[in-house]
Amino acid sequence: MNKPSPPLKKRGLGRGLEALLGSKGGSSVPPTVAEGQLPGEVLRTLQITQLQPSKYQPRREMSEPKLAELADSIKAQGVIQPIIVRELDVDMFEIVAGERRWRASQLAGLTEVPVLVRELDDRTVVAMALIENIQREDLNPLEEAQALQRLIDEFSLTHAEAAEAVGRSRAAVSNLLRLLELPLGIRTLLQSRRLEMGHARALLTLAPELADKLAKEAADQGWSVREVEHRAQQFAAGKVPDIRDKKSKSPASAPAQPDIASLETELSEHLGTKVAINHGRAGKGKLVIHYTDLDVLDGVLERLRARVAD
């Protein structure tokens, strides 16, 4: 028997859809669902087997550990936020937003979940799927850039319009999109989180072959963003630093305790930038959050505020 769920937290996708669809002549979407039920919207409980993923889902991979964490939360508290769906056929529904909740609910052993059934056209479904994914906290920079580019392509948006739709600055959106210009090898390192956005941006000024070589060394040797910036500047100035199997001499490259290193990685993934933990004696230490420019700092603050709000 399923555990009774607490009162549902009905939350929309913010002003993103309003900015995107309202300005393009589509139906305007209120800032939050809680302010009033949308026309044609029905709150229901459906069997998990009645739902299927959307063909417009831009996210290709979902972290198994993160799904397991969400499943544990659902076991304890139930599904707080309903899954948004649209009807496909008799007794079958397509997930518009909330596929992670659906998958985690299956892991948690639930047989039914709360849903909001909406009457939505393909255009709106695409917009909701893209915006939900872009606003997620655990996307790597390349996934964000790819989702933003698809949003721009689907709706013929300028960078400024895309920024308004997802609640980012225009500069932050433009910087993310530049990552798509990088060679495949560097994009792969970004995808696997072996490089950060700051590393990749420093490499944009170099020729593709040289950028690829420097990126591989940076990932293998664990260079900091500052180290990569310094070496890229040397190449741009006509100097050729030796990058053959030399580890950075920066104190930050000293080996960390396994548990500290694991914590640093987890925090870095959550905040989207490098995080260093300097753990001293008697349990004292420092937590250092690195940022290469104000856009990166902006992103860190957004993620921290989102955590506090939740």
From Swiss-Prot:
Organism superkingdom: Bacteria
Biological process, per Gene Ontology: chromosome segregation; positive regulation of sporulation resulting in formation of a cellular spore
Cited SUPFAM superfamilies: ParB/Sulfiredoxin
Pfam families recorded: HTH_ParB, ParB_dimer, ParBc
GO cellular-component term (any): chromosome
GO molecular function: DNA binding
SMART domains: ParB
Region called Disordered, residue ranges: 1-35, 239-259
Keywords per UniProt: Chromosome partition, DNA-binding
Functional summary from the UniProt entry: Involved in chromosome partition. Localize to both poles of the predivisional cell following completion of DNA replication. Binds to the DNA origin of replication.
UniProt record similarity statement: Belongs to the ParB family.
Protein name (Swiss-Prot/TrEMBL): Probable chromosome-partitioning protein ParB
Organism, as annotated: Xylella fastidiosa (strain 9a5c)
Gene that this sequence comes from: parB
